[in-house]
Amino acid sequence: MAHKSIVIFSVLAVLCHSASVKVPPIVDSSLPVKFSEVIAEPAPNVPSNLASYAYALDIYVQTTLSQLQCIKQAGYCAVFVRAYNPAGQGSFDTSSCVTIQNAYKAGLGIEIYMTPQPVSNKQGYQQLDEIIQGLTARAITVRAIWIQVTSPTNWPNNANSNINFINSIVSRARQSGLTVGIYTSYYDWNQITTGWSNIGNDVLLWYWNVYSGGVTGETPANFNDFRKFGCWTAPSVKQFAQDETVCGITVNRDVYLAGNVLKAVEEDGKIYAGGFVQGSLKI
């Protein structure tokens, strides 16, 4: 009888412990691995006395018009919308169309980024083609593309293969008349490409630097911590915060040089998105 009591108490203890454990929400797998289990918390307010920098958000979930209007009212000037989902073999993210259309209606600047799938049976340029075709079919014309090159564990352990994959996307973007940017960090770029420096001086840089996910892991919202790597001597955008909530959605926060982003425009019934971040701060 004593043995049975011990077993019962043990089971109850396990159940009680399980019930008290907080399970973190699912966070997008394209985020840096070490921050993938951070529970998002509300972001601080955007400063009202900005001079050199403007604030933006990068978003990977479908976002409503009311949420984007809230984002605009909160002091953000632009959104970076993910248009390619790396899950499986990778695919065009159809939900990005709704977010882009709503961002246009909210009066926000719009940039498009892709999280490619480097181990897919599709070449890099084919993945970009999917984005262009998918957005064009919905009356959205792409003028620029940002390519996410982060999380080295998601890439093959072969720098030459990775360089060829990235170059495939960059070359196709140039052929399509698009401005090209890379979203990466000093560490990621060196791990994935061993510091490839021949990507081209026309390619813009959006770098990330955070201490950890959440508000306490933010770095200063400026470019002062930038150090040269690859071919880049200056950045265009910095992601300084990850896994925070703004207007009820989980986002990452960014800054860029004030005055470099305009609203998306509509001509001939089409929305033209991307190509608004153009300049860089020479350091």
UniProtKB/Swiss-Prot annotation:
Residues 53-273 form the Ch-type lysozyme domain. GO terms for molecular function: lysozyme activity. Induction: Induced by Gram-negative bacterium S.marcescens infection. Induced by Gram-positive bacterium M.nematophilum infection. Transiently induced by Gram-negative bacteria S.boydii and S.flexneri. Down-regulated by exposure to Gram-positive bacterium B.thuringiensis spore toxins. Down-regulated by exposure to Gram-negative bacteria S.marcescens or P.aeruginosa infection. Down-regulated by Gram-positive bacterium S.aureus infection in the anterior part of the intestine. InterPro entries: GH25_Enzymes (IPR051595), Glyco_hydro_25 (IPR002053), Glycoside_hydrolase_SF (IPR017853). GO terms for biological process: cell wall macromolecule catabolic process; defense response to fungus; defense response to Gram-negative bacterium; defense response to Gram-positive bacterium; innate immune response; peptidoglycan catabolic process; signal transduction. Residues 1-18 form the signal peptide. Disruption phenotype: Increased abl-1, fat-5, clec-60 and rga-6 mRNA levels. Reduced survival in response to fungus C.neoformans infection. Reduced survival in response to bacterium B.thuringiensis infection. Increased survival in response to bacterium S.typhimurium infection. Susceptibility to S.typhimurium infection is abolished in an abl-1 (ok171) mutant background. Compared to wild-type, mutants grown in presence of bacterium M.nematophilum are more constipated, the tail swelling is increased, growth is slower and they are arrested at the L3 larval stage. Expressed in intestine. Expressed in rectal gland cells and head neurons. Disulfide bonds: none annotated. Gene3D superfamilies: Glycosidases (3.20.20.80). Keywords: Antimicrobial, Immunity, Innate immunity, Signal. Belongs to the glycosyl hydrolase 25 family. Plays a role in resistance to Gram-positive bacteria B.thuringiensis and M.nematophilum and Gram-negative bacteria S.boydii or S.flexneri infection and to fungus C.neoformans infection. Plays a role in susceptibility to Gram-negative bacterium S.typhimurium infection. This is Lysozyme-like protein 7. The lineage of its organism: Eukaryota, Metazoa, Ecdysozoa, Nematoda, Chromadorea.
